Amino acid sequence: GNCCIGNDTAYYWNGSSLKISPLEQVELLKKLYTNEFGFNEANVNAVKNAIMLSDNNSVKVYGKTGTGKIGNADVNGWFIGYIETVDNTYVFAINIKNEKNANGQKAIEITTSIFERMGIKIDL
């Protein structure tokens, strides 16, 4: 990202100059997943447990959603995370923008659709 959070530290991620691309988010999640940061493993596992959304034994979904608003309109939705299957781990970042109805739930729906086309059923 560009590290520009501005003066409003309570809401710097909404409507500010802060820019973090989906690719940068994916890279961050990959490093968290493999603990390339060298953090205490218990702390990394605590974060992973906190973002676990579902576990149906063959597919585990970890992630976080968000919604950016302008006035009452949902204009920016995102869903970032990773999915563990028996055979692989997939790291993803979905970001959608629109004049309205762009929210975290819509980003989940898009993500679910993409993985279902890959043959991976997500229970969220």
What is the role of each PLM region?
Residues G1-L29, T34:
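Mid-domain, small-residue-enriched loop/turn segments at the edges of structured enzyme/sensor domains
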